[in-house]
Amino acid sequence: MVTIHSIEEMLNYYISLGGLRKDAVNGFRYVFPRQHSKVRFWGDLHGFSAADADFTYPKDTIIRSQFSQRYVGIGLSEQGTVEAYTQRDQTIHFGEGVNCFVFDSPVPFFMKVPGGQRLRFQGLYFQEQFFAENNIPLYDSFWRDAKNTIHGADLHAPELVSIYRRIEQCRLTGLAFDTWLKGFGLEAA
């Protein structure tokens, strides 16, 4: 089992799997030559970010995540499945399509991924800090309500797919890209 408490630990985990960090326009990526895999990031991983992954775990893996900051993740999955749970008797299966995950407390969250399975997905991630930095007021029960309504749901959200595609294809760089991406985060939130 792998335990991850922060974004930095997640990035170090990629390195432990043989990932080589490379700079990319408006972000960075990890390439995994042995697995012919990659994970690409845009934006502020502690605020609003986007990711593109084409990754094959070399062996069966259980990841125990216990982040201190709450977040919403929206995955646009093209291939592969992941089993997720906070309690084994309440599992969620994330598969092809638009999936949503709400991490609303410091309770450990587990993801079980079969080895040798190719995972291809894009993601949009909204950390709690993003809402605070942009003065987006969240009512007291926002995180609990979000978890009760969209957590684990297969969503029909073509506008989110469109936002991801536009991020991926954007030709802006530097501060112009950062400002543009923040605007897209605000639009999506």
Question: Where on the chain are the PLM-derived regions?
Answer:
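N-terminal regulatory/effector-sensing and dimerization cores
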Residues: 28-141
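Short Lys/Arg-enriched alpha/beta "domain-start" segment
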Residues: 1-30
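Exposed alpha-helical structural elements
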Residues: 6-9, 137-138, 159-162
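Generic surface-pattern signal
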Residues: 12, 16-19, 136, 144, ...
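A general boundary/transition motif marking the beginning of the first structured unit of a protein
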Residues: 2, 41, 151-155
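A solvent-exposed, charged loop/short amphipathic helix patch at secondary-structure junctions
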Residues: 142-148
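An amphipathic alpha-helical interaction segment
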Residues: 124-134, 148-189
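Bulky hydrophobic/aromatic packing residues
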Residues: 11-15, 34, 51, 64-65, ...
